[in-house]
């Protein structure tokens, strides 16, 4: 993030989600509620997994890291957005904007790869249950999580470095946070090379991880169909479909944002897609991945009884 640039802009104005004053307070209250639920859900999940030894397994190790990623990348975006709802001047400095972009990309890339690791973990658990403890050793689990964060840090550094090379002559970002495509529209220099590089990098991340998830779930589905018990098959389908819905929502919204030309959709469409993967998905992930799980409910019940008595 030290690339030289000749931009005349020293600060940006964030356009926000809407220009209608009467909607500012309702939206503030809505997103404040979403953010509180996101923080409580993800912090609660991390704490619950840490306090209960029966949840110290690869599956919950990955879930706790997913909760950490969700908590972090929601916190990169939402607090500033909440301030802007009640502020007269929605300003962010050039350094602050690029820092927000960098950390957002770190965690959104990490989310892609964490979902992939979790899909692989479920594949091993369902398709190779006898080898699960051997394959998913503590050393491999730690290595996979370290790889996820390393890819996020490196990928974000490359993409943010590309954005730092652009010259910005306009200061109004038609978005509610500093994202790649809205920033490109403010550049007075050619963005073709940067846009192609970002398209390739984002495409690689999304396509490679989503294909890995799809292949893992294809094998999982094949194994589920071989379950003789209707009750067991129904339970497995229910869990698998919930996970797959969350993955599809995340990849669908990110692909809509990044795997297209920067002029291919309206501002409203871009905002809706962004809201899904920056605020809604981090709120729903603890519910979809964890709180519907009987082991988590049992651990929560034991923890609450331990505190009461």
Swiss-Prot record:
Topology feature Cytoplasmic, residues: 50-56, 112-133, 217-238, 292-309
Stored InterPro entries: GPCR_Rhodpsn, GPCR_Rhodpsn_7TM, Olfact_rcpt
Topological region Extracellular: 1-28, 78-90, 155-195, 260-270
Localization (cell): Cell membrane
Primary location class: membrane
One of the GO biological process terms: sensory perception of smell
Family according to the record: Belongs to the G-protein coupled receptor 1 family.
Protein's recorded name: Olfactory receptor 8A1
Species per Swiss-Prot/TrEMBL record: Mus musculus
Lineage of producing organism: Eukaryota, Metazoa, Chordata, Craniata, Vertebrata
Gene name of the encoded protein: Or8a1
């Amino acid at each position: 993030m030290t690339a030289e640039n000749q931009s005349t802009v020293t600060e940006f104005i964030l356009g926000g989600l809407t220009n209608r004053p009467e909607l500012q307070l309702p939206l503030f209250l809505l997103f404040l509620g979403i953010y509180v639920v996101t923080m409580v859900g993800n912090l609660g999940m991390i704490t619950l997994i840490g306090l209960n030894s029966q949840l110290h397994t690869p599956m919950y190790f990955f879930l706790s890291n997913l909760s950490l990623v969700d908590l972090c990348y929601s916190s990169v975006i939402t607090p500033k957005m909440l301030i802007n709802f009640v502020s007269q001047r929605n300003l962010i400095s050039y350094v602050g904007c690029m820092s927000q972009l960098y950390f957002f990309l770190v965690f959104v890339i990490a989310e892609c790869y964490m979902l992939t690791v979790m899909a692989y973990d479920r594949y091993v658990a369902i398709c190779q249950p006898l080898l699960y403890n051997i394959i998913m050793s503590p050393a491999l689990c730690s290595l996979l999580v370290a790889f996820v964060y390393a890819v996020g840090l490196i990928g974000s550094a490359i993409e943010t470095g590309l954005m730092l090379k652009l010259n910005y002559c306009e200061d109004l970002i038609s978005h509610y946070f500093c994202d790649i495509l809205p920033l490109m529209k403010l550049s007075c220099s050619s963005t073709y090379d940067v846009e192609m590089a970002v398209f390739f990098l984002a495409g690689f991340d999304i396509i490679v991880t989503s294909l890995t998830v799809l292949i893992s779930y294809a094998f999982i589905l094949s194994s589920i169909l071989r379950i003789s018990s209707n009750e067991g098959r129904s339970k497995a389908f229910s869990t698998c479909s919930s996970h797959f819905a969350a993955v599809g929502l995340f990849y669908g919204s990110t692909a809509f944002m990044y795997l297209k030309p920067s002029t291919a959709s309206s501002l409203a469409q871009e905002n809706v897609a962004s809201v899904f993967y920056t605020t809604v998905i981090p709120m729903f992930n603890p519910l979809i991945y964890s709180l519907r799980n009987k082991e988590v409910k049992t651990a929560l019940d034991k923890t609450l009884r331990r505190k009461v008595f």
